[in-house]
Amino acid sequence: MARSVWKGPFLDGYMLGKADKARASGRNEVIKIWSRRSTILPQFVGLTFGVYNGQKFIPVLVTENMIGHKFGEFSPTRTFYGHAVDKKAKRK
Amino acid sequence: MARIAGVNIPTNKRVLIALTYIHGIGRAKATEITTSLGIPAERRVNQLTDDEVLKIRELIDRDFQVEGDLRRAVAMNIKRLMDLGCYRGLRHRRGLPVHGQRTHTNARTRKGPAKPIAGKKKVTK
């Protein structure tokens, strides 16, 4: 079910401050964030966030299309390298 | 015989049912169409007057996205997710279920027919 509109988008409060500080500093360095549950807002467009996936910070360059998604969606938490081919497998 | 929304030629079924042969129109929208045009439920497609067919066509053109347009819109939505590099897009790319279902077993609709695993012995009697 979708979130009620009257609540507005969810995000952790400190996100805005972090984004402002990064903009003010001018240099585009990766902003490290742990808040994967925060919504991507229009004012984040163009910034690069390092979204923590439990192990490392995945750099995410926010584009216009990403507005409305959550940060966590762009930082996969699982790695799957496929199943190893069994060399001992015999043909019958 | 009546052509509505492009290529669809529903047969001599009741209008309500015949309309559901159009991609993008199910029972709900078909009911909406028939009631808003005042077509009785027992009316069949071959008993429709040309005027009524025209009205149905106009209503669908105006209010609903059907057939090719709808298919294109859905494909575009999926493509957007895939280009975005978000989790749902990755799942679409790999042909795995998108909505968090289990994949340990089942998920055969997305994964397709089961592939045999090399070296696994068959239990035979």
UniProtKB/Swiss-Prot annotation, chain A:
GO terms for biological process: ribosomal small subunit assembly; translation. Gene3D superfamilies: 30s Ribosomal Protein S19, Chain A. Keywords: Ribonucleoprotein, Ribosomal protein, RNA-binding, rRNA-binding. The keyword S-adenosyl-L-methionine does not apply. One of its GO terms (molecular function) is rRNA binding. GO terms for cellular component: cytoplasm; small ribosomal subunit. Pfam families: Ribosomal_S19 (PF00203). It comes from the Bacteria. Belongs to the universal ribosomal protein uS19 family. Protein S19 forms a complex with S13 that binds strongly to the 16S ribosomal RNA. This is Small ribosomal subunit protein uS19. It comes from Paramagnetospirillum magneticum (strain ATCC 700264 / AMB-1) (Magnetospirillum magneticum). The gene is rpsS.
